UniProtKB/Swiss-Prot annotation:
Entry keyword Iron-sulfur: no
Family affiliation: Belongs to the DapB family.
Ligand binding ((S)-2,3,4,5-tetrahydrodipicolinate): 239-240
Described function: Catalyzes the conversion of 4-hydroxy-tetrahydrodipicolinate (HTPA) to tetrahydrodipicolinate.
Chief site of localization: plastid
Organelle transit peptide residues: 1-51
Protein name according to UniProt: 4-hydroxy-tetrahydrodipicolinate reductase 1, chloroplastic
InterPro entries recorded: DapB_C (IPR022663), DapB_N (IPR000846), DHDPR_bac (IPR023940), Dihydrodipicolinate_Rdtase_pln (IPR011859), NAD(P)-bd_dom_sf (IPR036291)
Active-site residues annotated for this sequence: 230 (proton donor/acceptor), 234 (proton donor)
Annotated EC: 1.17.1.8
GO biological process: diaminopimelate biosynthetic process; lysine biosynthetic process via diaminopimelate
A Pfam family that the UniProt record links to this protein: DapB_N
SUPFAM superfamilies: NAD(P)-binding Rossmann-fold domains
Amino acid sequence: MATNGLMASSSVFLHRPRIAFASRTNQTVGKYGKGRVSFMGIGTRRLPVVLSMTAMADSGEEAVKSVLPGNGISIMVNGCSGKMGKAVIKAADSAGVNIVPISFGSAGEDGQRVEVCGKEITVHGPTEREKVLSSVFEKHPELIVVDYTIPSAVNDNAELYSKVGVPFVMGTTGGDRNKLYETVEEAKIYAVISPQMGKQVVAFLAAMEIMAEQFPGAFSGYSLDVMESHQASKLDASGTAKAVISCFQELGVSYDMDQIQLIRDPKQQVEMVGVPEEHISGHAFHLYHLTSPDETVSFEFQHNVCGRSIYAEGTVDAVLFLAKKIRLKADQRIYNMIDVLREGNMR
């Protein structure tokens, strides 16, 4: 089987256009592990394996309404002008969480007002952020900050939250992750840190890490093809895909990360991948295809997400989880989405 990409002429996927991504069935807290891309630093606790998963944005609308009331929790969503920030505000509002009408953004956004769910939120630029955050925290001592900003701001933002002492949920990817954990650990504040807030996707990733640890070398000699499709604005390869590939590498598969086939062209996304046109601007489709050396055995793993509600709902659950830990004065201070799942907060 050809291994130079899923769109190669000899690839089996060309015999199945439009369904390449279609579902066939319609802690270590702290530094990341070394040697491979460990998505969550999950540790050694293991769960059953999940093979395929598809989520649609609108399907979670009713689920988000089932969240327990906010119980006095207030959140400040930094990056509120972005699509994820707005999605989190909508999910939090449905959950009964109080939305503080203040947010941090870029210098160009300073002074802007963003309206979401009938709430007008004032955006503050980089200047006087510490003064503003301290004032908000004093007024709302139950405050939890949610960060959906940009990768280059991750470490500066974490340092700010740590200096003020406000707990936070970090949904922004990138930055120096080791430094991020060190900053929070030194400040001894409460935080949920995760580059992937979709709980079901996190469960799939956990299952992959379980399989990799329990059955190293199980797929030795197999070839791997990986295709991922995201909105055109995402220029880099999926971190989720890299984490799954790392698991396959431990399972004995030889594969370089630069072999990942990135689909960013809207026409290909609709015609070949099968992304609904209404979700071209916001989706995350992943497909992993394994083939035995003699091409008599093949395995497929996939997870497809349309929209952002799966991430927004997971973020709200992380907020509720963290608020509970703060009230209980838990000894552990830094958590990830695996901890949220283990708490039984699946909606």
